[in-house]
Amino acid sequence: MGVQAYTFRNHFPKSTENTLDIIQKMGITELEGGATKGYTEEQFKKLCNDRGISIPSTGVGYDELANPLEAVRRAKTLGAKFVMCAWIPHKGTDFTLEDAQKAVTLFNSAGKVFKENGITFTYHDHGYEFHAYEDGTLMDYIIKNTNPAYVSFEMDVLWTMHGGGADMPVKLLKKYPNRWKLMHVKIG
């Protein structure tokens, strides 16, 4: 079982080492995240490894995808096999076809670079992608128009339900069974 570093966003700034100790005591052995402020990737990886925590996935900002080699370097240093982008810039709640089209182009080109370097690129949804489009949603558009060889997905169950309804996670898993590589599940 793993945890997203964002879950501990209020703890890490106080003490990275104490936060990792808490994560270890919880029995968690995988962390999705990257080096915290004041630590290099090498130092952060060692702190995690010393506690039996691996880092299978790390994040990348949307703007970084135009030149993904720095994200490749960070991921390799951390030992991550997945790099996840969690946000497509858009205005307010108005996520448009044009936003989705730009993302598809960027995801395909960056995803190719990640694949060439032995890393799987994933996009993490946040609910705004579920605006109606043709016979589905803009999320369908993104999935259908990204190259499966280069782009995979990380479903956030809560955000998928928020944007698409209570049955949307199951629908998407059935509709695109081979595209989902990672999943966020929130416990309320």
Give the residues covered by each predicted segment.
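Short secondary-structure boundary segments
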Residues: 35, 87, 187
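Histidine-acidic metal/acid-base catalytic patches
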Residues: 1-26, 79, 134-151, 155-188
